[in-house]
Swiss-Prot record:
Record's protein name: Ribosomal RNA large subunit methyltransferase H
Pfam families, per the entry: SPOUT_MTase (PF02590)
Species name: Citrobacter koseri (strain ATCC BAA-895 / CDC 4225-83 / SGSC4696)
S-adenosyl-L-methionine as UniProt keyword: yes
Alphabetized GO MF terms: rRNA (pseudouridine-N3-)-methyltransferase activity
Length: 155
């Protein structure tokens, strides 16, 4: 199974790239994890936000292809680390690759939400999207460590 983080936004601060890459390199070869960045639409004071969201959503869904789609969204289901490890095991048994979608400043398009098989909430707080990339990578790595009895996670 391959994990894919599909996120709106490019040009992240160095600390985001450093943190994300640190966890990316830790993933085992049998569970590769990749980042696909979708360029954010231009948002000016007269921008058509619905059109921008729709375009970003089309690009995200095209990148995900036939993968299982999991959106990251505040109203999603909050999983603690053991629950995420259980979900990771279920995803592996499903046999498909998994695309986790992170929207732009206004969130995800209705099409992305409709295509999602699951929606995961990292927090009831609104988190900066660059930080979410690092949190997701670390959380998935920690979940993997639980499923393989790797010493990274300690109870």
């Amino acid at each position: 199974m391959k994990l894919q983080l599909v996120a709106v936004g490019t040009k992240m601060p160095d600390w985001v790239q450093t943190g994300f890459t640190e966890y990316l390199r830790r993933f085992p070869k049998d569970m590769p994890f990749e980042l696909i960045e979708i360029p954010a639409g231009k948002r000016g004071k007269n921008a058509d936000i619905k059109r921008i969201l729709d375009k970003e959503g089309e690009q995200m869904l095209a990148a995900a292809g036939k993968n299982r789609i999991v959106t990251l969204d505040i109203p999603g289901k909050p999983w603690d680390t053991p629950q995420l490890a259980t979900e990771l095991e279920r995803w592996k048994l499903d046999g498909r690759d998994v695309s986790l979608l992170i929207g732009g400043p206004e969130g995800l398009s209705p099409a992305c939400k409709a295509a999602a098989e699951q929606s995961w909430s990292l927090s009831a707080l609104t988190l900066p999207h660059p930080l979410v990339r690092v949190l997701v990578a670390e959380s998935l790595y920690r979940a993997w460590s639980i499923t393989t009895n790797h010493p990274y996670h300690r109870e």
